[in-house]
Amino acid sequence: MSIQDKPFTIAGVTFSSRLILGTGKYPSHDIMKRCHESSGTEMVTVAVRRLDLKATGEASLMNWIDRNRLRLLPNTALCYTADDAVRTCRLAEELGMSKWVKLEVLGDEKTLYPDVEETVKAARILVKEGFTVLPYTSDDPITARKLEDAGCAAVMPLAAPIGSGLGIRNPHNIRLILETVKVPVIVDAGVGTASDAAIAMELGVEAVLMNTAIAGAQDPVRMAVAMKKAVEAGRDAYLAGRIPRKAYGSASSPIDGLVHH
């Protein structure tokens, strides 16, 4: 019996694509736009503190994002305190970007792991101010529950350090988070190639967020297509239900009516 599929919905908004992309590290704005189109994504993140607000025309990143098709998710990359993150979200709102935010409060410059205490603190403030908060967090079910209790619209545990491409390092913890919270779980960070995205989706998460895996590929547009297919295949595999793992082989051909010589 397969699992019944359900729409990917965040804060009452339903998305057809379960793939969320970033806007950084691409060889060019044109390639970024082509990747967004090829991937089928409907939501993209933008690092507010990296935006060149003086840029105009083709030099402006924002002019390469199709706001009619894509929901903007400003993020608080490079923030190391709750106060910085909250100020950055307020700036994004003032710039007319969005009240939806990817909350990212880092605790360490080397690993880029989240400071979960500051993340929860910022989440509580932002939710009270009416933001729809999607927090980048560790693969810890206790923190995930605290973020859900704070009013976050989803939780986004890392699969591995940001930009590492190490893949799904701790699938057990991702499963624990899925059992712990009722809001959507989105794997964020660590995906390196299409098989990583498929594995993440096979765990039962609602979506995958990535940037470097596509932007840093030798052929970003082709990788965007691969990621689209991987996310769809992983979701289908999760819904279909995999066979149990066994220690020994099991013949696939029936033995009834076997011809004996």
From Swiss-Prot:
Record keyword Cell division present: no
Highest taxon listed in the record's lineage: Bacteria
Subcellular locations according to the entry: Cytoplasm
Cysteine pairings via disulfide bonds: none
Pathway the protein takes part in: Cofactor biosynthesis; thiamine diphosphate biosynthesis
Binding site for 1-deoxy-D-xylulose 5-phosphate: 163, 189-190, 211-212
GO molecular function, one term: thiazole synthase activity
Keywords on record: Cytoplasm, Schiff base, Thiamine biosynthesis, Transferase
EC number: 2.8.1.10
GO biological process, one term: thiamine diphosphate biosynthetic process
Catalytic-site annotation from UniProt: 102
Catalytic activity: [ThiS sulfur-carrier protein]-C-terminal-Gly-aminoethanethioate + 2-iminoacetate + 1-deoxy-D-xylulose 5-phosphate = [ThiS sulfur-carrier protein]-C-terminal Gly-Gly + 2-[(2R,5Z)-2-carboxy-4-methylthiazol-5(2H)-ylidene]ethyl phosphate + 2 H2O + H(+)
Transmembrane segments: none
GO CC entries: cytoplasm
Alphabetical list of HAMAP family matching this protein: ThiG
Complex formation: Homotetramer. Forms heterodimers with either ThiH or ThiS.
Family listed: Belongs to the ThiG family.
Role according to the record: Catalyzes the rearrangement of 1-deoxy-D-xylulose 5-phosphate (DXP) to produce the thiazole phosphate moiety of thiamine. Sulfur is provided by the thiocarboxylate moiety of the carrier protein ThiS. In vitro, sulfur can be provided by H(2)S.
Protein name stated in the entry: Thiazole synthase
